[in-house]
């Protein structure tokens, strides 16, 4: 691809765009998001999408078509952001933040697929075929993105060196400016990004050199992947498909192999070259592997459908089915280009297939971030339908999945709350209430009387007085699972041979053990230690041992080291 001619005015405009992007993101995140979280969900994605498309595509700010594309991108991003905001309302902050990052990844993929079409519509000279320009644009956009990451990384490394050197002589101004001043961080990121894009777009020959390096690597990998493809497909008749169906990750592995085969072929198959860069036997190997690629997709679809039939739809399975659809279209397109040539160079049809696949993926990504293919809704509806039809039992209802599924999941949890059959199990009820109301709801139910009534006293141990129960509720989080009848067991043992028995609380629902000791001076009980409960120690085993008198203590074989009165704990596995 030839160097892009950018006028001085366009370059200054791009620099201003980068600075404005940093400034707007700073205002949205540092100032406005604290008042209303919607500023981040709506403002940041729309701002970054708008400015990124402008930086990657602009040739002249006077092009009306450019502003039409930018308006379309801005409106579409706002629409998808609105849908994300509606989904994540009421979701816990950590999950909402993860959903926003996932949305950012979707936007990045959409941008990489849409940019070649925008750039092609804005180019001044139409001296190459549509696919040839598309192929070059995808390469350049991906490598420009790589240059952006490298430029920002190197810039911040230099700034880190700068600040650390001045810290050596007691000057902390630069460290504060570079790494603790929000406006400087955002403006620097925007400026460096704009400069990196200008450099990469005006020095296309350097980008072409990097492209050739990666193409050579793909040229060496494709025969190896093709050999793997053929060897595995030859092995299948001897092992049978049943071996695949037993593995959860089978569909993912098969789709990954098919994707590698197709993407490497798309990389190596330069539309400017008339033939493949291999000798006869290797060409035959690669073409044969491409012919069997649809078989991998069909087998992956079969393995995936088995899981859907057995367990219903989930977010991952829906995405897997969409990946099957894309790879099936892609692989069958390559299959037809090899088998049904009619004297035509396969690269012509393969180019059309690649263009169609790029549009298909773009449409799917947009639909996934809209009500049409809402993966959360589909997953929750499938899960609840299986429960209501009796295919899933109450114990098979996944509260965690519902909790992480936004509005739809919360509505499903509310319906389970009124389900007497589901709520009759104390543990399920506790998990459900915790998912709906948070841990604070359970902690508020913890009281001295509730603990005294529900904690099981092991045989041979004495029921504590009110002083002990008062000590327990000082940290309600550690004992909130003990509000269920017999969920926790209390055992008395003298662990330090001082004549005063310590009390050990076994919280089996939380897999933890808490040791309490009595302070004779303050006349109070204190939590001395907390550790994880080994899987080998069950409630039944503990109660049986207490009943049979098999509870005791074992002195440690290794003693602690004392250095001039200072004690060094020696904890060795025995």
From Swiss-Prot:
Its main location: membrane. To B.subtilis YrdB. It is a multi-pass membrane protein. It holds the Pfam family DUF4153. One of its GO terms (cellular component) is plasma membrane. It comes from Escherichia coli (strain K12). It comes from the Bacteria. InterPro entries: DUF4153 (IPR025291). The keyword Transmembrane helix applies. Keywords: Cell membrane, Membrane, Transmembrane, Transmembrane helix. It is found in: Cell membrane. The chain crosses the membrane at residues 12-32, 39-59, 66-86, 99-119, 142-162, 178-198, 214-234, 248-268, 286-306, 320-340, 353-373. The keyword Transcription regulation does not apply. This is Uncharacterized protein YhgE. Disulfide bonds: none annotated.
């Amino acid at each position: 691809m030839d160097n892009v001619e950018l006028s001085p005015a366009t370059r200054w405009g791009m620099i201003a765009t980068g600075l404005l992007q940093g400034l707007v993101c700073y205002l949205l995140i540092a100032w406005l998001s604290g008042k209303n979280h919607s500023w981040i969900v709506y403002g940041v994605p729309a701002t970054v999408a708008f400015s990124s498309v402008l930086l990657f595509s602009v040739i002249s700010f006077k092009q009306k078509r450019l502003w039409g594309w930018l308006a379309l991108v801005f409106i579409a991003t706002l629409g998808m952001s609105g849908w994300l905001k509606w989904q994540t309302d009421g979701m816990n902050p950590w999950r909402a933040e993860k959903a926003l990052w996932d949305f950012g990844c979707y936007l990045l993929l959409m941008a990489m697929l849409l940019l070649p079409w925008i750039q092609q519509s804005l180019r001044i000279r139409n001296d190459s075929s549509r696919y040839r320009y598309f192929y070059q644009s995808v390469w350049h956009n991906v490598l420009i993105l790589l240059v952006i990451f490298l430029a920002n990384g190197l810039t911040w490394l230099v700034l880190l060196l700068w600040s650390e050197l001045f810290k050596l002589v007691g000057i902390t101004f630069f460290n504060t400016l570079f790494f603790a001043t929000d406006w400087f961080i955002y403006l620097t990121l925007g400026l460096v990004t704009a400069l990196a894009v200008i450099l990469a777009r005006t020095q296309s020959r350097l980008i072409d050199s990097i492209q050739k390096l990666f193409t050579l690597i793909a040229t060496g990998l494709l025969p190896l992947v093709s050999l793997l493809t053929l060897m595995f497909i030859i092995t299948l008749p001897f092992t049978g498909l049943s071996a695949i169906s037993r593995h959860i990750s089978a569909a993912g592995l098969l789709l990954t192999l098919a994707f590698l085969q197709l993407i490497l072929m798309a990389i190596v198959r330069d539309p400017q070259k008339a033939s493949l860069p291999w000798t006869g036997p290797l060409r035959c190997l690669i073409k044969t592997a491409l012919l069997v690629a649809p078989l991998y997709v069909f087998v992956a679809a079969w393995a995936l459908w088995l899981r859907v039939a057995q367990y219903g739809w989930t977010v991952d399975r829906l995405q897997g089915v969409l990946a099957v659809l894309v790879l099936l279209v892609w692989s069958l397109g390559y299959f037809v280009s090899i088998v049904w040539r009619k004297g035509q160079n396969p690269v012509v049809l393969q180019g059309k297939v690649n263009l169609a696949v790029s549009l298909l993926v773009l449409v799917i990504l947009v639909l996934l971030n809209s009500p049409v293919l809402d993966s959360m809704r589909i997953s929750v509806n499938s899960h609840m339908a299986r429960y209501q039809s009796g295919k899933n039992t109450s114990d098979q209802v996944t509260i965690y999945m519902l909790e992480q599924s936004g509005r739809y999941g919360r509505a499903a949890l509310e319906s389970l709350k009124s389900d007497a059959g589901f709520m009759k199990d104390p543990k399920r009820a506790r998990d459900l209430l915790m998912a709906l109301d948070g841990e604070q709801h359970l902690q508020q139910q913890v009281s001295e009387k509730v603990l005294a009534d529900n904690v099981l006293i092991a045989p041979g141990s004495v029921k504590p007085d009110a002083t002990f129960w008062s000590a327990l509720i000082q940290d309600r989080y550690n004992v909130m699972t003990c509000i269920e009848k017999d969920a926790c067991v209390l055992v008395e043992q003298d662990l330090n041979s001082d004549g005063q028995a310590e009390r050990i609380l076994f919280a089996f629902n939380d897999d933890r053990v808490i040791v309490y000791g009595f302070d004779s001076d303050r006349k109070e009980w204190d939590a001395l230690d907390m550790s994880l409960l080994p899987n080998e120690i069950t409630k039944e085993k503990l109660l049986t041992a207490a009943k049979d008198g098999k509870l005791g203590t074992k002195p440690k074989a290794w003693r602690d080291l004392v250095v001039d009165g200072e004690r060094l704990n020696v904890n060795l596995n025995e």
